[in-house]
Amino acid sequence: LRLVGSEMCIRDRDIGNKYAVTGLARLFYRRIGEHYNKFEQWTFPPSVATATMNRFVKDADLDVLYYRRITNAKVQNKRIQSITLEDSQKPDKKTLIQVKAKQFIDCSYEGDLMAKAGVSYFVGREGNEEYDETLNGVQMSFWHQFPDGVDPYLKEGDPNSGLCWGIQPNTLKERGSGDKLVQAYNFRLCLTDNKENQRPFEKPENYDPAKYELLARAIRKMDLHIDNYLLFNWGMMPDNKYDVNNRGPLSTDMIGMNYEYPDGNYATRERIWQEHVDYTKGLLYFLTHDERVPSKLRDQVSRFGWAKDEFVDNDNFPTQLYVREARRLNGEYIMTQKNCQGEETCLLYTSPSPRDGATS
């Protein structure tokens, strides 16, 4: 629900053959199809995904604890005996509850249960030598690059004036080397060009136009416009809606501003989360209102707005930050590049029985 109900509603299946999708996942896409009077449907807006997931919960008669987050895990003899949860909206001792079970499964983005249980993990990107890989670690990417000639200084041509927002003065490490940095986060947006179901992009309370100076300079250097996908990745959905993702040198990804998130406490994560909200809303306001943006581009972006019937309890804004990566479990078997390229296959092994209370 956290994934499809808030963000990934179109393209991130990342498979070449839909017949590889089976089980409950296949049933999910076929139930989405029922909504559109089709056999199955692979693209869909968040509201339809949420309703479909809630149907699964209702059919299974599950008790779901919403807005709860872990504060502690009691472990004995390498087995989780119980976990303590607090109400994320009212985090005090009065809201604490304890949950006991034979098995606990951490299906979260962040892996907080894993960390609280003392399981070893890694944050960042391993170097090539760690698992004899070639595509991990520091890499130079062809995509999402600035054009030549974009000045990085606050006052163009003056190194003494300081760097524009978003630029870090660090030296790029050797290709293939490891570090503790994580892939950028963003919000996957649900926008529409249907004027009858649309809210305009409004100026956010903490709007700072300086955060988009580099984008303004890139626009001057390139013929950046909305149709050729140089600003956003547009995924078409039913009902004149679009799943909007990052693309280009400066887009919806808030690059370099999430490094504290994986191991951060809840207050740190909340700060980072809100910074991403402000940045994203500010980006769309900038593109539709700032005079540094050519009128042609402003008009193109202004065709779109927030879908009024999506995320109705959250100002029509996504409820989930796209945490692309955080903690990585150091498990009995670790998937590597060789697995992805078909050079190695994980052999089956006997794991501890769920009845023993093993963690997953």
What residue ranges belong to the model's regions?
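Short low-complexity, flexible loop/linker segments enriched in glycine and/or proline
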Residues: 11, 80-81, 136-140
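Conserved beta-strand-loop-beta-strand element in the redox core of flavoprotein oxidoreductases
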Residues: 76-97
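Structured loop/turn residues at beta-strand edges in well-structured enzyme cores
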Residues: 4, 78, 99-102
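Conserved N-terminal/central alpha/beta ligand/cofactor-binding core
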Residues: 6-7, 11-72, 76, 122, ...
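Flavin (FAD/FMN)-binding glycine-rich loop and adjacent Rossmann-like elements that form
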Residues: 91-103, 107-351, 355, 360
